[in-house]
Amino acid sequence: IGGDGFSFVTPEKSGVEEIRETLGERQAIREQHWTRIHSLGGVELGDDVEIGANAAIDRGTIRATRIGRGTKVDSLVQVGHNVTVGEDCLLCGLVGIAGSARIGNRVVLGGQVGVSDNIFVGDDVIAGGATKIFTNAPAGRVLLGSPAMKMEAHVEATKNIRRLPRLYAQVAELRETVKKLLEKDDRD
């Protein structure tokens, strides 16, 4: 708890910044050197917080990284620099919360959930195992999948994907029927 945050800078715009701005286009690939930004903040743990084995909570760059009262952090959880976690949250094993994310109160992040940097996860959000949250999540939302989506939409999308082989076979059968009908018309 309180290790240096994962903050680095380059003298000029980095390839990562360029891709973030252009959504994938990259000019010339050039040499770049990373310089550490030392973390001057601390870590504040509220009352009744529990931290599992091998969990890592980075200290903030300037302000503190905060874990709210009553929050339970499982083993092998990574909380990045400047993160704020609300009260009474559950962060299950292998959760990763990137720097400067804000997590509301009573949030449950299932095992292997990933939260991108600089986003907000609202109060009472529940994210099922292995969900990847790339954008802000409104309060009360139940999320699944990668990228995260409403549970109902994820379940429907998964059902549709499982139906694809059957649908493909039906389309192939229809194509064959149409082909035979066209050949019959050509002969008549």
Residue ranges, per PLM feature:
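Long, leucine- and charge-enriched amphipathic alpha-helices
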Residues: 149-188
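Structural signal for interior beta-strand "rungs" in well-ordered beta-sheet cores
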Residues: 1-14, 23-150
